[in-house]
Amino acid sequence: IQSTNMDQQGSLTEDSMNSFIRTLIQAGIWKNKVPKQTARAKDDTQTTVKKTEAEADAVASKEARLGFQPIVSVDAELLRQQRRFSSPRVLLSENTPLEPPPLYLTEQPVALNRTSRRKREGKSHRGEYSVCDSESRWVTDKSSAVDIRGHQVTVLGEIRMGPS
């Protein structure tokens, strides 16, 4: 951690305290998590540097008065709070889509050029593309198919969710 600037009287300025807080948060260091830094003196004795701890305690007492709760580490809970994820091909979201995919041929116009990816007609979302280029329509009259490993599988016409 780099040392912070001090004004002429020896007290921390507000800007330097803010930058120090940011440095602590970015480094994942706060209150009890401040490591004791040791420095070797020329005569091979170790001296504990307590300046960082004193500055952290001063900032912590000020922030406690303001009701500030620092973020110590980034964990899975913080990542779960993100509602939108980034993908170049599709929009990933925890929410269900506004409209279901078309189930019948009449609901979706047949594309003339099957090799190009095109956005769905009508109301669409950013990055919403067809998953498969080789098939441009929904197949609803199949009872069996071949999976990607070459095995024969049964196609379900309806999937029931919840208690039966």
UniProtKB/Swiss-Prot annotation:
It is found in: Secreted. Glycans are attached at N113. It comes from the Eukaryota. GO terms for cellular component: axon; dendrite; extracellular space; synaptic vesicle. It holds the Pfam family NGF. Keywords: Cleavage on pair of basic residues, Glycoprotein, Growth factor, Secreted, Signal. Residues 1-3 form the signal peptide. GO terms for biological process: cell surface receptor protein tyrosine kinase signaling pathway; modulation of chemical synaptic transmission; negative regulation of neuron apoptotic process; nerve development; nerve growth factor signaling pathway; neuron projection morphogenesis. Residues 4-120 form a propeptide. Belongs to the NGF-beta family. PANTHER family: NERVE GROWTH FACTOR NGF -RELATED, NEUROTROPHIN-3. Seems to promote the survival of visceral and proprioceptive sensory neurons. This is Neurotrophin-3.
